[in-house]
Amino acid sequence: KPLILCTFLLIINFFSAQKKPLDHSVYDAWQSVGSRLISNDGKWLGYYVDAQEGDGNLYLYSTINKTQQKFPRASKLFLTSDSKFAIFTVKPFYKDIKAVKDKKLKKDKLTKDSLYIINLSTNKIEKIANVKSYKSPFKGGSFVAYLLENLKEKSTDSPKDDDKDDAKDDDDKNAKPSELVVINLATGQKQSFQNVVKYQFSENGKQLAFVTQKPEEKKDPKDKDKEKDKPKDKSKPKKYALQSVNLVNLENFAINKLIEEEGDFAQLTFDKSATQFALTGTTSAENDLVKDYNLYYFSKNKNAVLNQKSAKMPKDWVISENQAPNFSKDGKQLYFGVAPKPIAKDTALIANDHAILDVWSYKDDYLKTIQLKNLNKDLKKSYDAVLQTEKPELLTALSHPKMDSIAIINEGNAPFSLGISNNDSRAESQWTGAEKKNYYIVNNLTGEATEFLKNLNGRIYPSPLGKFMVYFNREDGNWYAYNVDKKSTTQLNKGLAVQFTDEEFDMPDYPNAYGLEGFTDKDFSVIIKDRYDLWEFFLDGKTAPKNITNGFGRKNKISFDTYQLDKDIRSFNRNAEMYLFAFNEENKQSGIFKTKIATAKNPEQLQMGDFYGYRNLVKAKNAEVYSYTKETYQEAPNVYISDNFKTE
């Protein structure tokens, strides 16, 4: 018997030894589902499967044919607004990228990205090598523009994180001019532009803006050596290269040159209709310690250049290079940044001859550690200004150091903005942990600010059309609505026995709210949740609130949340079906329900099960096609697609 027992134990140990040990090499290979994208017509789903460390894969799935294709190392997927083309880049192998970074080699030692363009009808794939970046209009059919790598110029850059956004490349002041190729994918028409450093489509795909830069003249190596030996005269102005800003009409590829000067121009911005255009730029010397920036505005009827000499510009303030201009949705207002003129650094001081101190006072707004952390951000701080495009030569400063931020209202269409200031509570927040804020209605024509709310410890939500400011006060746990026209405030949950703050909060602080889910059309009402259910509060203050899930959530211990399935739709239709994410607190099941706000009945269950899913639901813009993930503690997240949530 002892012999048999020993033999049995040896067998167990042998098989146990065959198991692969759990180390970095194992969990580096673990995979997870990444972001998902559905074509507007719902016929195509793109999703990523990412490795913890290594090369991920992109999958393109046909919801019609139930087939899919795999593309290793793909990223930056875009499905054109007409749902006819898929565009993405393919990166070098992860091991090659890592080797370049580990060895601190220059980027030109690495294979460049490739661009793939797939015709979704024919499955024809066009591959373009050595692509630095690409863009396609969000709502403009089948156009694509891509900037090729400048392989003639050797890079002097350190290796960068390839996952960073391409927008940083667009504003890279050291970018080398290269070839920009624009293609109308629907017709095959192609146009190339040389020496391009920046480019941008209008949202509707009707216009393309790009900036060209005159390349540096090639110098004889002998002359370069002589220049190295000469002492550099930093006082002598060094001019920028000659740049030109151009607009391309994408119907006929006609070019309109707007600017041609020695300078640096960036932040190319169109309005929604592509009939107005703005950008920032400087024509100061490249080695000036303080540069003067201009805001350029162009339209069919009027052009304007704004700078520190413009009417109504605050004294000793300038146009900010650190805030991109932004048109209102209706194109009648243009928001941009202004800032106090920077003080030039004294380059004559010798650092070793002067003490460098960090001095802190108990009266400072922030702890010194916070000040140092935010130093670069504070040096680039911009304040908001606006101009009316009917009179673009006049600006109105909206924010300033005592009211240092604003929120634009109704996508910028409103004649006023929401001013926000935390100046009065900054020092206090060092020990309370919460910043109380004051709120103002700021007139976009005059800049006059009228305070309507003081010392709010909570959060404020402007309604989509700007008729109301709904806010939650953490200190009393109540919801309020401020009527902008009537200048009156109403407590929304007055008289309700339901608690709208965290019922299980057990810390010595004020509890947070469960959240505001959104507004209904025309600023009619607001949807706010308690622990389980959703409530509709009518902003006119005359109608009693309704529990739109009819108490079903609290009765069954199911918590409901809404979805935002279309970013272009900013409010709920009270009579349309809306989908709700559901989570059962008792058995931990999750699922999806549907209801209508106007009916206030028990929501209809579509699916509920022993999994966690539906939290990250995405929808096709023009079709009833949905994608979601489901997972359990035993099964990793899987991707599903459905048109009714009953079959998948």
Identify the role of each PLM range:
Residues 2-11:
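Sec-dependent N-terminal signal peptides
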Residues 633-648:
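An N-terminal hydrophobic leader/cap segment in hydrolases
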Residues 6, 15-625, 631-637:
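Beta-propeller folds
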